[in-house]
Design a protein with these regions (language model features):
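P-loop (Walker A) phosphate-binding loop of NTP-binding proteins
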Residues: 30-32
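Phosphate-binding P-loop
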Residues: 18-24
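Short hydrophobic/aromatic beta-strand immediately N-terminal to the Walker A/P-loop
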Residues: 26-28
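N-terminal pre-Walker A segment at the start of P-loop NTPase domains
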Residues: 1-17
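Short beta-strand-centered segment that lines the nucleotide-binding/catalytic pocket of NTP-utilizing
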Residues: 50-65
Length: 138
């Protein structure tokens, strides 16, 4: 998928992304700070019926949410500095759980991403408009 969208259109974009990537358990979100990674994940969780408050797990590293299809692990790897640190934090266990993992800042520990990954790349066009490009990377 590749398109421009506004916040008013985010539910449509999230629905299309889920249709494209729902069978891939690892989702990697690439975007600059403030582009809307957490906003996108919040909209996705809303679409999936998550009732918990959705927020960026910058300090906790991982937030777990429940939805009808099971568990979602929302991860923020911004503060991770190495593969060893990620393993000590138990990140690899979530990645191998088979549950959906939504990862912000995956570029900080790229060696953890094995197998198929649903990549979502967001960029800012202007104050109200974002661009999304998604693909499955083997």
């Amino acid at each position: 998928m590749e398109q421009n969208f506004t916040l008013d259109q985010i539910q449509e974009v999230v629905t299309a992304a889920w249709a494209e990537g729902k069978d891939i358990p690892i989702w990697a979100f690439y975007a600059a700070m403030g582009t809307g990674k957490t906003t996108f994940i919040h909209a996705l969780c809303t679409m999936l019926g998550v009732e918990d408050a959705v927020s960026s797990p910058t300090f906790a590293l991982v937030n777990e949410y429940q939805y009808e299809g099971g568990s979602l692990f929302h991860m923020d790897w911004y503060r991770l500095g190495s593969l060893e640190e990620a393993i000590r934090a138990g990140i690899d266990e979530h990645l191998h759980s088979g549950d959906t993992c939504l990862i912000e800042w995956p570029e900080n520990v790229p060696d953890l991403l094995a197998g198929p990954v649903f990549e979502i790349r967001l960029s800012r066009i202007d104050e109200k408009t974002r661009h999304i490009y998604s693909r499955v990377k083997s």
